[in-house]
From Swiss-Prot:
Function description: Destroys radicals which are normally produced within the cells and which are toxic to biological systems.
Natural source organism: Medicago sativa
Gene3D superfamilies per the UniProt record, alphabetical: Superoxide dismutase, copper/zinc binding domain
Subunit structure: Homotetramer.
Enzyme nomenclature, EC number: 1.15.1.1
UniProt record similarity statement: Belongs to the Cu-Zn superoxide dismutase family.
Disulfide bond annotation, renumbered to this chain: C105-C194
Top enzyme category: oxidoreductase
Record: transit peptide: 1-48
Catalytic reaction(s) noted: 2 superoxide + 2 H(+) = H2O2 + O2
Positions contributing to Cu cation binding: H94, H96, H111, H168
Subcellular localization: Plastid, Chloroplast
Listed name of the protein: Superoxide dismutase [Cu-Zn], chloroplastic
Cofactor note: Binds 1 copper ion per subunit.
Length: 202
């Protein structure tokens, strides 16, 4: 096959040309087209999008509420709680294993506990991941709280999406009450209302 030559349309001096040959083809290009300025190209940085989830709590009583969960990157999850219809005082508040409410809140199963530890306070090293402590209802039965916790991520193998948040009848003793249920449920009594955690637009 005859050799073919591709030339730049404008006159170029020999020192301003780059030559490359392959398969009998000779290519001559101006450096301004063949050389890319590194200063114009910056490495791409990947930023994980923030995640947001919501749970609407309902039960067989007048207790109801809305809980939102937000997380940015690998930071702890922020939980904003507002529940109404409670008796004044402390109420256990937990994340439970399953998002199954076919039999009411009882079918949400035990506390979310991927590490198979005993029940404790949110600040304890030994605790269920779903141990979120107590929320406090005021004289009007309204509980508002903000919880920041690093064991309830919205992504990854231990994601809480599809699990259920539950508010309980009694105060959670945080595993320190000496009751036979202290190290499993905090002896927090019945389940007043629950809601499945689902993703929502940020």
């Amino acid at each position: 096959m005859a050799s073919h030559s591709l030339m730049s349309p404008s006159p170029l001096t020999s020192h301003s040309l780059l030559r490359s040959s392959f398969s009998g083809v000779s290519v001559k290009l101006s450096p301004q087209f063949s050389t890319l300025s590194r200063s114009k190209f910056q490495p791409l940085s990947v930023v994980a999008a923030a995640k947001k989830a919501v749970a609407v709590l309902k039960g067989n009583s007048t207790v109801e509420g809305v809980v939102t969960l937000t997380q940015e990157n690998e930071s702890p999850t922020t939980v904003n709680v507002r529940i109404t219809g409670l008796t004044p005082g402390l109420h256990g508040f937990h994340l439970h294993e399953y998002g199954d409410t076919t039999n009411g809140c009882i079918s949400t199963g035990p506390h979310f506990n991927p590490n198979q530890l005993t029940h404790g306070a949110p600040e304890d090293e030994i605790r269920h991941a779903g141990d979120l402590g107590n929320i406090i209802a005021d004289a009007n039965g309204v509980a508002e709280a903000t919880i920041v916790d690093n064991q309830i991520p919205l992504t990854g193998p231990n994601s809480v999406i599809g699990r259920a948040l539950v508010v309980h009848e009694l105060e959670d003793d945080l595993g320190k009450g000496g009751h036979e249920l202290s190290l499993s449920t905090g002896n927090a009594g019945g389940r007043l209302a629950c809601g499945v955690v689902g993703l929502t637009p940020v």
